[in-house]
UniProtKB/Swiss-Prot annotation:
<comment type="similarity">
    <text>Belongs to the PPase family.</text>
</comment>
<comment type="function">
    <text>Hydrolyzes PPi generated in anabolic reactions.</text>
</comment>
<keyword id="KW-0378">Hydrolase</keyword>
<keyword id="KW-0460">Magnesium</keyword>
<dbReference type="GO" id="GO:0046872">
    <property type="term" value="F:metal ion binding"/>
</dbReference>
<dbReference type="GO" id="GO:0005737">
    <property type="term" value="C:cytoplasm"/>
</dbReference>
<dbReference type="GO" id="GO:0004427">
    <property type="term" value="F:inorganic diphosphate phosphatase activity"/>
</dbReference>
<keyword id="KW-0963">Cytoplasm</keyword>
<protein>
    <recommendedName>
        <fullName>Inorganic pyrophosphatase</fullName>
        <ecNumber>3.6.1.1</ecNumber>
    </recommendedName>
</protein>
<keyword id="KW-0479">Metal-binding</keyword>
Length: 25
């Protein structure tokens, strides 16, 4: 998981990303 790949966003948005994108990606 690379936080640098996703733009800054609310924590709720980050949670959604974590759910949509497997940690292994």
């Amino acid at each position: 998981m690379d936080l640098s790949r996703i733009p800054p966003q609310p924590k709720a948005g980050i949670l959604n990303v974590l759910i949509e994108i497997p940690a292994g990606s």
